[in-house]
C-alpha cells in the first residue's frame, strides 16, 4: 500500500477464476446435463467485493493469495482500481469456481480454493488493516486469517459466506455481520434476531426482497428491494457487500456507525445489487458509482 495513502476499505478475501456453464437446469444427483458455451472470467467473493468497493468510490486495497499462473495474471488485471501491493503469490494454483447457471438466472457453485487456502497476513497487511476505516472479509479463506484480520480492525464487516458454523471467538470480533437467510440460519437458527446475541449489528439479505437491518439499539429496519429483470445473480451479494463497505467508509466516523448510516448504506448496496443482476458475469456485472448514484436518486430520492 502506498505509504501516504491509507485505504478506506481493505478486503481480506478470495480470488477465483470462474468457469461458467450455462444449462437449461442445474443437474440433480446422478444426472448429467449438457451445457452451452463455457466462459471463463475473474471472480471469487473477495475479488468481486473489492472491485465493487473500488467502483463505488472507496480507496480499496486487497489482501489476497494468487497462483503463479494464467488465472493469477488475469485476476491481477481484473482487479482494476484495487491496490494489490499486499497481494501474495502462492505455490498453489489460483482458486477456481465452477458455476452452473440456469436460464432463470439461478446458479450453483463448487469452489476449489487453491491459493486462497494459503492466505496469511504479513506485518504490512496487519498494519494496513489496522489503519483502514472498514475491513471486509468472507469465508473462502482460512478462518484463522479472518480471525486475525478481525482482531486487527477498527470496524470489521464479515460476509459469512459460504454458510458455516462460526466460533463465538470469531463472532466476538465482528462489528457488522452480512448474511443471506441460509447463512443466518447456520449461525443463529431460524430466529434471525438471535444473531444479535452474537454480533452487535447484522444485515440479512433477502434476494429480490431487499434486506433487513438488525441492531441492538433499534427495531428491525426493513429496506425493500429494487424490482428488476434478472439476467444473472452471480456477484449480486458481493456487489452488495462491497458497496455497503464503501458507503459506510464514506459516511461514518469509525467508532459511531449508526442505524441511519446503515440504512443509507444498505439502500445504496441494494441499488448496486439490482444493477449487477441485470448483467452477466461476476466482475463485469459490478456497477460504477455514477450508475449507482443515478439509480439511487430514481429509487429513493
Model-derived segments and spans:
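Positively charged, low-complexity intrinsically disordered leader regions
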Residues: 1-27
Amino acid at each position: 500500500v502506498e505509504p501516504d495513502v491509507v485505504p478506506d476499505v481493505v478486503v481480506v478475501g478470495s480470488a477465483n477464476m470462474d468457469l461458467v456453464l450455462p444449462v437449461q437446469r442445474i443437474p440433480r444427483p446422478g444426472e448429467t446435463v449438457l451445457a452451452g458455451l463455457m466462459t471463463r472470467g475473474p471472480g471469487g467473493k473477495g475479488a468481486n467485493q473489492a472491485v465493487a468497493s473500488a467502483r463505488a468510490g472507496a480507496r480499496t486495497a486487497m489482501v489476497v493469495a494468487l497462483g503463479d499462473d494464467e488465472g493469477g495474471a488475469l485476476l491481477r488485471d481484473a482487479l482494476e482500481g484495487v491496490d494489490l501491493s499486499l497481494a501474495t503469490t502462492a505455490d498453489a494454483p489460483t482458486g477456481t469456481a465452477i458455476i452452473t447457471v440456469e436460464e432463470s438466472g439461478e446458479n450453483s457453485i463448487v469452489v476449489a480454493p487453491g491459493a486462497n487456502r494459503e492466505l496469511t497476513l504479513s506485518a504490512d497487511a496487519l498494519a494496513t488493516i489496522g489503519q483502514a476505516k472498514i475491513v471486509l472479509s468472507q469465508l473462502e479463506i482460512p478462518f484463522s486469517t479472518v480471525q486475525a484480520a478481525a482482531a486487527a480492525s477498527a470496524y470489521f464487516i464479515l460476509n459469512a459466506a459460504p454458510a458455516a458454523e462460526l466460533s463465538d471467538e470469531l463472532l466476538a470480533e465482528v462489528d457488522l455481520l452480512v448474511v443471506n437467510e441460509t447463512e443466518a440460519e447456520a449461525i443463529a437458527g431460524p430466529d434471525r434476531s438471535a444473531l444479535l446475541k452474537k454480533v452487535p449489528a447484522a444485515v440479512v439479505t433477502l434476494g429480490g426482497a431487499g434486506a433487513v437491518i438488525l441492531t441492538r439499539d433499534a427495531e428491525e429496519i426493513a429496506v425493500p428491494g429494487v424490482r428488476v429483470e434478472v439476467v444473472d445473480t452471480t456477484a449480486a451479494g458481493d456487489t452488495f457487500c462491497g458497496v455497503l463497505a464503501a458507503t459506510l467508509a464514506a459516511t461514518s466516523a469509525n467508532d459511531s456507525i449508526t442505524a441511519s448510516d446503515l440504512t443509507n448504506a444498505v439502500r445504496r448496496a441494494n441499488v448496486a445489487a439490482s444493477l449487477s443482476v441485470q448483467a452477466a458475469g461476476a466482475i463485469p456485472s459490478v456497477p460504477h458509482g455514477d450508475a449507482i448514484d443515478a439509480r439511487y436518486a430514481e429509487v429513493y430520492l
